[in-house]
């Protein structure tokens, strides 16, 4: 296996693990085994990632030097490092990075007060977001020209404004267990940044979801897990606080021929109030909570994990699927969850190769 040969490795603050990939795997496995030995002594599956060209979303700073312009990353020791390529980004990003930079250098108005660039890719598409310290509406003509040259979706953001040239949404296709799933989402959506690992995560969850009746999902986003799981359950109730994500999720149901999911824009705390019949919500007026027979609950919380009230709520369910982007908060949450449940399955997903980041998933079953 070819190791990370990036010329910026020892200086860039993004890839912090300067070691062969086999050693990175051992490091992460040992970390998890040590920290979770009180909760699980069974098998822990490790899902490897490609070690290059795996990241589908990336953001770079920009360094201005007279008439020159360079991409930057934060240095490991502070400050900024000028770069002209990045080995971990999707191939489509690698190809368009120098093209975009050359076009920006041609036009003083386009590059003035431009401080960052974000790239988002799917399997077949790419979207570019330019970040300005000025009112981008003053350079609409130049941005229109730039989009015509790039022939991809282009967004300019500045001081609360968002200008769109072409499309601001992306179409994705995932292949999981011999079946394809279609998604659409906007530029502000939370997406899994490693497509290969995302497919493995969904596949693993599907493989370890059995004896299914109805599913309750918290933090569902645009339906990344919801859509594939809907084919295993009678009915699904999924919650999310972002209106844009809910709209994308509804569209994704149409794209995949799914009609057994109800999406509702509620926070986890509001959902608990609804289930305890402490409060009525207009957003639930067409949903009969008593009609569901939930056999599983899936949570994919932010890095802070679930607070005690949410943990007390999800402990009511026979089967818990917990996706975690922070093993330390997962460990804290398991201290309470394992009073009523045991960890049945445990997996590590290497979303961010060459970093300390560890993504985990556990399946818990009630005693």
Curated annotation (Swiss-Prot):
Its EC number is 2.1.1.-, 2.1.1.35. Pfam families: tRNA_U5-meth_tr. Gene3D superfamilies: 2.40.50.1070, Vaccinia Virus protein VP39 (3.40.50.150). The active site is at 325 (nucleophile), 359 (proton acceptor). The keyword rRNA-binding does not apply. GO terms for cellular component: cytosol. S-adenosyl-L-methionine binds at residues 192, 219, 224, 240, 300. It catalyses: uridine(54) in tRNA + S-adenosyl-L-methionine = 5-methyluridine(54) in tRNA + S-adenosyl-L-homocysteine + H(+); uridine(341) in tmRNA + S-adenosyl-L-methionine = 5-methyluridine(341) in tmRNA + S-adenosyl-L-homocysteine + H(+). GO terms for biological process: methylation; tRNA processing. Signal peptide: none annotated. GO terms for molecular function: rRNA binding; tRNA (uracil(54)-C5)-methyltransferase activity, S-adenosyl methionine-dependent; tRNA binding. Keywords: Methyltransferase, S-adenosyl-L-methionine, Transferase, tRNA processing. Belongs to the class I-like SAM-binding methyltransferase superfamily. RNA M5U methyltransferase family. TrmA subfamily. Dual-specificity methyltransferase that catalyzes the formation of 5-methyluridine at position 54 (m5U54) in all tRNAs, and that of position 341 (m5U341) in tmRNA (transfer-mRNA). NCBIfam families: trmA_only. PANTHER family: TRNA/TMRNA (URACIL-C(5))-METHYLTRANSFERASE, TRNA_TMRNA (URACIL-C(5))-METHYLTRANSFERASE. This is tRNA/tmRNA (uracil-C(5))-methyltransferase. It comes from Campylobacter fetus subsp. fetus (strain 82-40).
